[in-house]
């Protein structure tokens, strides 16, 4: 039976401010990426999210981003050196590892967030710095990378275990990059459309661009953003469609 991982970005509230329905999304995901305090999240939210994931048998990963709470980590931060990027990534991974130990759970993977990921997909220095930080913290951590990107090449060069990611609810350009969130249609919202799209991604090993071009991509994990309106309904629809197609859902990290 074909198996695929479903991952969600969670723990992205801050203090009294909540983002998304983490408890519901954890019931539908097999892996979650937890904000580590820079673009969102705090120690209490991190621990609560880890506890929910452990109770649900869901793998957890660090979701490091630029230090930009106001912009939710979706704005590039210019002028950072490779060492500064390594520091901010290692800092955030370590924070989640420490909090996870309180809940008796283990961090299995790392996925860069927002603008940090977007920049790294096109900039070798940023991509290599992220990979170097992960390797320095724990060379066994799985590096979640966007297919056909510089992040992928950096992870390969560093010798890290990799999980190739595609996005259920994001549109793709013909060059396999994500359509900018500033453009209309960048984020998809129709649960039925997204569910059918994910099944095709897994079965065909390809995504369809905004112009209708089929782009071959290895697919180890499919991301559904927890902050997308209707995220729970989207995730539920994807799970149901995968089941109907005979595709099992399981963590890429092996549980």
UniProtKB/Swiss-Prot annotation:
Pfam families: LamB_YcsF. One of its GO terms (molecular function) is 5-oxoprolinase (ATP-hydrolyzing) activity. It catalyses: 5-oxo-L-proline + ATP + 2 H2O = L-glutamate + ADP + phosphate + H(+). Its EC number is 3.5.2.9. Keywords: ATP-binding, Hydrolase, Nucleotide-binding. The keyword Protein biosynthesis does not apply. GO terms for biological process: carbohydrate metabolic process. The keyword rRNA-binding does not apply. Catalyzes the cleavage of 5-oxoproline to form L-glutamate coupled to the hydrolysis of ATP to ADP and inorganic phosphate. Belongs to the LamB/PxpA family. Forms a complex composed of PxpA, PxpB and PxpC. This is 5-oxoprolinase subunit A.
